[in-house]
């Protein structure tokens, strides 16, 4: 097989037996003991399968993860069905409408659509149902921005919809910040208790 993050629970129906949730917990525990890190401010970020994994971390390792950033990733429907984090979780997510690996509309009974993921997190976090919106064109690419705000503990769910965007880490500029900067600027506002 190929290397990947196992973003599903280890069960008889999961083709992977890698215990990546346990590995991540052990890694965080080791880093917390050996380095001076703030255990209330641990964030996860990923692309593609890594983004799928950080969504799952927000569900299954929520005792450690304060906020996540996901690029071109989706949640398994099974993950949504079993997702019960210990606290409201701030989410920033980027996805292209022409993504052929993680389709924007999901894959029936396998990957949830971006809309279903947003509905899950906005419902769980009790955010506004009507997002703040904006749109810009960056180098000929239309970017639609949706911010679901006023969630429990100050959480937000932010979605950057890249119209005709592919399965990539987006090289975009939104209000002077690139994708990596947007993620850091967002997640760093949070700790395990919510908005700092």
Regions found by a protein language model. Name each.
Residues 66-153:
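The feature captures the conserved acid-bearing segment of alpha/beta-hydrolase catalytic domains
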Residues 29-36, 58-66, 119-126, 188-192:
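Sec-exported extracytoplasmic/periplasmic mature domains
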């Amino acid at each position: 097989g190929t290397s990947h993050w196992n973003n599903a629970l280890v069960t008889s129906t999961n083709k992977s037996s890698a215990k990546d949730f346990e590995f991540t917990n052990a890694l965080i525990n080791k880093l917390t003991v050996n380095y001076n890190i703030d255990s209330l401010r641990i964030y996860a970020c990923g692309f593609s399968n890594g983004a799928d994994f950080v969504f799952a971390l927000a569900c299954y390792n929520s005792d450690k993860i304060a906020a996540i950033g996901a690029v071109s990733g989706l949640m398994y429907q099974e993950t949504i069905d079993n997702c019960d984090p210990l606290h409201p979780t701030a989410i920033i997510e980027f996805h292209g409408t022409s993504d052929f690996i993680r389709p924007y509309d999901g894959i029936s009974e396998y990957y949830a659509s971006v809309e279903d993921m947003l509905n899950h997190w906005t419902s769980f976090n009790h955010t506004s149902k009507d997002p703040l919106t904006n749109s810009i064109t960056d180098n000929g690419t239309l970017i639609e921005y949706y911010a679901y705000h006023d969630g429990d503990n100050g959480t937000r769910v932010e979605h950057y919809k890249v119209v005709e965007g592919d399965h990539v880490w987006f090289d975009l500029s939104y209000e002077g910040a690139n994708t990596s900067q947007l993620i850091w600027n967002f997640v760093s506002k949070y700790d395990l208790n919510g908005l700092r």
